[in-house]
Structure formats: C-alpha cells, structure tokens
C-alpha cells in the first residue's frame, strides 16, 4: 500500500475518536439503554430478480431503529440465504445483542467487536446494528456519515445498474430504462450467456460488467467465456466459478484478458490473504462482511495486496444503500442500485442522479422514514 493510501484509510479510523476528543465531554455522557426495535419488511421487486441460482419477486429484510434522546438511528439487514441467514434468524440474533447495546455506544468499535463475537454468521444483522449505531452517533454530532469517516463525497464512483437474467427482449428493455447509467452490470452464468451479451450489445454500446454468481463450473469454460466477453466490451467479470475452486482461480488469473473480481469467495478482511492470488479485485458488501467498520478494514487490506476494490449491495432499501455510499469514496467501482430495484422503499432522502448516488450534508445516513410512527 502506498503511504498516501495508508494515511487516507488510517484517517477513516481516526476521525471518530478525534471528534470525540475535541467535543464537550458532556456530549458523550451515557447513562441509559437505547430503545431498540426491529421488524421484518417485505421488499417488492419492480421486476422478477433472477441470478444463476434462483428467482425472487420479494425479499424479506429487517429494519432496525435505535432511539435515545429523541434521536433515531436506522439500520437494515438484507439476509443472505447462501450463508444460512434469514429475517427470523436475524431477529433472534438481535435479541442476543440487546445487552451489548445497553453499554456506551460511543465506544462503537468495542460494541461491534462484542456483537461480532456472539456468532460466526449473521453478518447482515450485524451490519444493521453497526449502521444504526453510527447513524445515531452522527446525528448526535450533527455530521453526515461520510464526514465522520473522514471521506470526500466528491470521490464517489458512478454506480452500475444491474440487469437480472431474463428473456433477452426483457433484458433489452431494462437496458433502455437504464439510460441515465454510464455503466451496466449484466447477470450471467447460464447456458445462454453469449446470446445475452449479444442481445445487450444490439441496444447499447455502454461499458458492461458481468456477474456469473459462480455459474460456470469448469475453468476452461470460464476462460473461454471471459476472453470472449473481453472482446464484447466487458470491463471485468465477478465470481465466474464456485468459491471453493481457488486453485482454478489461480490458473484462470494468469490467462484472462480482463480482471476477475471475487464476491462469494470472501466475506471479511481476514479472508483476503488466502484468495488474493486468484483474483484481481474484491467486491465488498456491508451485508456480507458485517457492516461499515469491517468494510473500511477490507478496503485497506485489499489495497495492501494491490487489489482493485468494488463496493456492492444486496436488494436493499435506501438505508442500506446510503450506508454503503458513505464508504464508497474508498473504492474503485460501485454497484449500489439495490434500492432502485424495489417498488416500496420505506426511506426517503437518497437520490441517484446520472448514475451516481448523491450524498447530502444531512446528519447520519441522510435518510428518513415513516415506517415508525412514534
């Protein structure tokens, strides 16, 4: 990692503690528990969402609110079934975490470590608690989250809009609807991938990125498809093969014409050293790694291994996307469109304009909701 990059990432970790040292001591007095509420919320997708491993019309997320002194901090969990998570398991984990949240949340790093140690998994609900705590702290300080992290909102990369697997005419129509986005992400990993990309190319000449979601099972197949896609204007491919095929990824890395980005092959910063030799970059997701703090650590470790960094998302509301967007000045590529895929976003205040998520100077995440009426 270059000295400049190290200092930038170090600044992210130092920013919160410096603010605490500089502010009036009484601001940080902690003498009572938070009110904590979490509820399942069904997200209705605008279009059926199909990947190489399934189709969904509805996703069940968990919305979290912590409240104290008239200030609400919001968080969101988008459970990942691949890792054994569900909305119900997230609620059960949150009950285990309640005693930790009765402690001083100004010591938010300690609280996150204690929450993380409660169980190996449940990263999505850990992310919800992490973002809710930081949203509350930032609102108390009257600071937007990106400034609390020491990051410049002017460095946010453009986000892709994802096109799920569908009949080619429907995918072409989704491309037309994405006219404001400079780069598109196309889901692949099927027997019809060539026809899909050729069909997309009939209606746009924009740069493309593809995501196979582990859909290609042989390295020779992956190599052939990736190098063919390179000639079709595809910039990089995410997770072409199953995560367990690490030696095949090492073989593939030396032979492909465009970068291969790891997604399902890793979850947290500790996973990066073991997979770095097989990839050109990584995809960080708050729901996969456990929250904002771990995402920042992952970006730092990835840079140390000279890897490109992408920030992705699940199907989420504007709360989850706002949290990820605050971290996005640290990364090279962004795929933060989860809120644009749903028809019933309960949060307001976040905009995506000409393919960029717009961070405001409102405190915390910068989003509001009428989901809680009190």
Placement of each model-derived feature along the sequence:
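Conserved, mostly hydrophobic/aromatic
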Residues: 64, 70, 129, 142, ...
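Flexible C-terminal active-site loop/helix
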Residues: 8-11, 28-45, 61, 69, ...
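Metal- or metallocofactor-binding catalytic centers and their adjacent structured scaffolds
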Residues: 30-38, 54, 67, 72-140
């Amino acid at each position: 990692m270059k000295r400049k990059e190290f200092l930038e990432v170090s600044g992210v970790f130092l920013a919160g503690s410096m603010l605490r040292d500089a502010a009036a001591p009484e601001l940080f007095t902690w003498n009572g528990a938070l009110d904590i509420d979490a509820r399942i919320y069904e997200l209705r997708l605008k279009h059926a969402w199909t990947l190489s491993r399934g189709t969904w019309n509805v996703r069940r997320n968990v919305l979290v609110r912590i409240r104290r002194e008239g200030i609400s901090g919001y968080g969101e969990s988008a459970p990942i079934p691949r890792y054994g998570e569900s909305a119900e398991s997230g609620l059960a984990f949150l009950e285990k975490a309640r005693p930790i949240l009765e402690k001083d949340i100004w010591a938010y790093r300690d609280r996150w470590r204690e929450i993380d140690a409660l169980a190996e998994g449940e990263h999505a609900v850990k992310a919800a608690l992490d973002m809710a705590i930081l949203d509350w702290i930032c609102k108390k300080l009257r600071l937007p989250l990106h400034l609390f992290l020491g990051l410049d909102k002017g460095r946010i990369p453009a986000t892709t809009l994802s096109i799920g697997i569908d009949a080619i005419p429907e995918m072409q129509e989704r491309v037309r609807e994405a006219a404001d986005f400079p780069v598109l992400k196309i889901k692949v990993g099927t027997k019809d991938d060539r026809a899909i990309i050729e069909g997309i190319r009939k209606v746009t000449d924009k740069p493309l990125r593809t995501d196979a979601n582990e859909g290609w099972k042989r390295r020779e197949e992956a190599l052939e498809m990736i190098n063919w896609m390179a000639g079709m204007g595809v910039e990089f491919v995410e997770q072409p093969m199953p995560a367990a095929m690490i030696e095949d990824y090492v073989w593939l890395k030396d032979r492909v014409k465009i970068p291969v980005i790891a997604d399902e092959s890793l979850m947290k910063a500790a996973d990066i050293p073991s997979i770095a030799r097989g990839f050109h970059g990584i995809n960080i997701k708050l729901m996969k790694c456990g929250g904002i703090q771990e995402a920042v650590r992952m970006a730092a470790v990835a840079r140390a291994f000279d890897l490109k960094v992408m920030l992705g998302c699940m199907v989420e509301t504007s709360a989850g996307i706002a949290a990820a967007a605050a971290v996005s000045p640290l990364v090279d590529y962004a795929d933060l469109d989860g809120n644009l895929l749903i028809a019933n976003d309960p949060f307001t205040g976040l905009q995506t304009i000409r393919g960029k998520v717009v961070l405001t100077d409102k405190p915390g995440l910068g989003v509001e909701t009428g989901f809680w009426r009190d």
